[in-house]
Amino acid sequence: MKVAVFSDVQAVLPALEAVIEHIEAWHPDMVVMAGDLVNRGPDSGGCLALFDGMRRERGWLPVYGNHEVWVLRCGVQAPASEGEREMRRFTDLAWQQVAD
């Protein structure tokens, strides 16, 4: 059984597209995205939409990483301090992209 595992796309859509191209050429039996698909980069929403399509169409499996947990937390909890507010600038942007 061939298993492809990738992680740390960090919301860079061209990187995810390149990964998909390589994986598709390899023809694995199973594909696992091992976290950190979103956050930090410019296109969390685009990466999530593309991966979700692969999940639905091809059965790719997601595993949440710390960035997914952090983005989800931003959707439900206000920053605890001014320092956390500054840290969350990009994460809040990622939340806005994926919440739509």
Sequence positions of predicted segments:
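N-terminal active-site segment of His-dependent metallophosphoesterases
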Residues: 1-50, 56-60
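Active-site neighborhood of divalent metal-dependent phosphoester bond hydrolases
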Residues: 40, 47-100
